[in-house]
Amino acid sequence: MSIIEHLEQLLEYGLERKLISIWDREYTRNRLYEALGITHPEPNSSTSIKQSQSLPDLLAPIYKWAAETGRMEADTDTYRDLLSAKLMGCFVPAPSEVIRKFEETKALYGPKQATKEFYQYSEDVYYIRTDRIAKNVHWTVPTEYGELEMTINLSKPEKDPKAIAAAKEQEQTNYPMCLLCKENVGFEGSVNHPARQNHRIIPVILEDEQWFLQFSPYVYYPEHCIVLKGEHEPMEISKKTFERLLSFLGQYPHYFIGSNADLPIVGGSILSHDHFQGGAHDFPMARAEAEDVYELNDYPGVSLGLVKWPMSVLRLQGDEPGHVAEAADHIFRTWQTYSDEKAGIAAYTGDTPHNTVTPIARRRGDLYELDIVLRNNRTDEEHPLGIFHPHQEVHHIKKENIGLIEVMGLAILPGRLQEEMKETAAALCSADPKTALEQNPLTAKHSEWALRTMEKRTITKENVDLVIKEELGHVFARILEHAGVFKQTAEGKQAFRRFIDQLGAKPVKSLNR
């Protein structure tokens, strides 16, 4: 099949998905020719799309042709991503038209339908690459804190050597300033920065400020969205943060929304641009119950719950978002300066602050619910990466920061674990597991953990994969306990209640009494 016929199939896909109308066919065809540098197309016989062909299958022969004819540097993930965004950008109308359609759907059918359609649209134009996301491995594990969700992340492509070399040669630029800036919309991209011709964002007003809604190209849960500030300003938790989160819920009540903490170690991977993450998912933490419920003396109509969770979580509920934001700010300001030597909590080292929060908001019927997760980023000699961070004993599984998504009970584990766990399973079923584990460079770092697992579990060839997945879930629960500022011990729970006393809270009921 010729390149012209492959492009005709891509046009048919666009028509079938209603990305373009029949009146856009010639215009879009010419844009595709321009994108590929085709100046003298040969006449073609119209080719109808095979219904079984997915978008990645339609794009594959175009990549091959582009690489063979010098239109693409190399047939690798980096260059394929740049070309696919350029090609699919030919099907995407101006931002104003995407916004108009979104707002029209929202007005006629409500925000839930509008976000659902916009999500589908983001998939159809290949901004969300479902073929990549499908590679991720998912499972759940029951624990004392409820069922935790586990993911091995295989969706982010590795940079190929050619692209890495090209990136070193390329002139550094500050446009767009980061991956979240609104200037990414329609951006051509480079080996250093993803192409975004097929990317669109929806304006949202939060507390009289301009923010934007988009979806994450690396979806970790249903309708995983990012809400970003219009201006490139750093992450900062304040009363305004709580007000913005609750304002968003007023407009999109079917989503949860949360913010990463604003300090290194306990924050997310991007601290330079203020943003939230949300979506249509009920996380394990949201399903966790409050062990104790309190009234706050100065905030009538707002209840405070101590959540049964490995991290230290206070749950506010109220029907007035303004009152909930006031109570959240009270907790935050109290925590910012709170120290408890017996619990190992120090608010400051000199002038350097350590205490902050990870806030997560959702609607619960008519109520506004705001979880305040207490965080501290202090380090010491024993824990140079963070005292309330995954400890050395679990680094063979994960040593990265515990951000918003993991705080809520969804583990995002590194892709290396897929092969390492496969090798670990084989070693555990071998004649000499200890030697097999210790001599294999892929499993040596897991050997102590794997041998301990063997001592407490009966392992067979039939159940080894399940046992490993369950034990990874238990490691994740322990990682969350490490990140918790008040520990799951009698002393830790007592220390947590000392902090609650500082808030002026009065007990109402307890599941423990």
Curated annotation (Swiss-Prot):
The keyword Lipid metabolism does not apply. It is found in: Cytoplasm. Keywords: Carbohydrate metabolism, Cytoplasm, Galactose metabolism, Nucleotidyltransferase, Transferase. InterPro entries: GalP_uridyl_Trfase_II (IPR000766), GalP_uridyl_Trfase_II_CS (IPR023425), GalP_Utransf_C (IPR005850), GalP_Utransf_N (IPR005849). Its main location: cytoplasm. Belongs to the galactose-1-phosphate uridylyltransferase type 2 family. GO terms for biological process: galactose metabolic process. HAMAP family: GalP_UDP_trans (MF_00571). PANTHER family: DUF4922 DOMAIN-CONTAINING PROTEIN, GALACTOSE-1-PHOSPHATE URIDYLYLTRANSFERASE. Pfam families: GalP_UDP_tr_C (PF02744), GalP_UDP_transf (PF01087). The lineage of its organism: Bacteria, Bacillati, Bacillota, Bacilli, Bacillales. Its EC number is 2.7.7.12. This is Galactose-1-phosphate uridylyltransferase.
